[in-house]
């Protein structure tokens, strides 16, 4: 009976393939890979579900950037940077595939509401791709600092961490809003408040950086990497708030005053 058991195991293994890794899943579309559905409304809903997933993947990309910033092992640094590059390529492809799908839906007969939905989602896809671009730009700046053996002071590291926290809060909020069926005034306000915090903190750090460089607290080469990271984070905040504004501007989303 042992031979039969072994044969059974082989058959089951073939019939039930192993669960793909998270990284393998990242390369596949989940909701629109099978093509358009029976109605434009359902197809647009599927595209929006894909956009929610797109947002969540971009959020994970930012998490990888934060890991890269703290990585000190050379081999691990190279591996993490390669993963971020992979995420960037996936992001570019997702933008094109979602936009192409929405454009095909737009070729059919649509209500005015469906037309507005497509326009809104196309705008959102473009902004999320810009968020991913900012993540990649941050990774490249970190790589430049790594190659130049740039060392930051404890204060600079703390400031970068605070800025990362603000941007991460903003991107988490963006994903939350995209998932929600109703847009709350409180969610819009929270996004705008985070954007204001990011802008104000950027301005504060730029001013302090000039003082610190003049006081020789760190070399100018370090300040360039430092400020490039801060400015890129602020740009990311702009793209994130643009996503929320696209939803708020749309007549399709019911806005509750909460």
Tell me the role of every PLM-derived stretch.
Residues 1-258:
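Cytosolic, long alpha-helical scaffolding segments
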């Amino acid at each position: 009976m042992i031979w039969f058991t072994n044969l059974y195991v082989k058959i089951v293994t073939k019939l039930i393939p192993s669960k793909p890794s998270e990284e393998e899943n990242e390369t596949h579309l989940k909701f629109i890979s099978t093509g358009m559905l029976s109605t434009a409304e359902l197809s647009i809903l599927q595209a929006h579900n894909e956009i929610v997933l797109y947002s969540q993947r971009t959020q994970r990309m930012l998490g990888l950037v934060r890991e890269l910033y703290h990585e000190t092992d050379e081999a691990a640094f190279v591996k993490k940077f390669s993963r971020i590059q992979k995420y960037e390529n996936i992001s570019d492809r997702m933008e094109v595939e979602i936009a192409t799908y929405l454009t095909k839906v737009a070729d059919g007969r649509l209500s005015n509401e469906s037309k507005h939905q497509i326009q809104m989602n196309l705008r959102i896809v473009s902004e999320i791709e810009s968020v991913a671009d900012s993540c990649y730009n941050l990774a490249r700046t970190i790589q430049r600092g790594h190659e130049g053996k740039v060392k930051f002071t404890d204060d600079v590291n703390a400031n970068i961490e605070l800025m990362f926290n603000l941007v991460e809060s903003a991107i988490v909020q963006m994903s939350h809003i995209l998932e929600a069926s109703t847009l709350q005034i409180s969610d819009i306000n929270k996004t705008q408040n985070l954007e204001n915090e990011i802008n104000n903190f950027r301005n504060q750090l730029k001013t302090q950086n000039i003082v610190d460089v003049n006081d020789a607290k760190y070399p100018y080469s370090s300040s360039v990497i430092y400020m490039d990271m801060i400015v890129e984070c602020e740009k990311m905040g702009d793209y994130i708030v643009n996503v929320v504004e696209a939803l708020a501007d749309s007549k399709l989303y019911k806005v509750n005053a909460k």
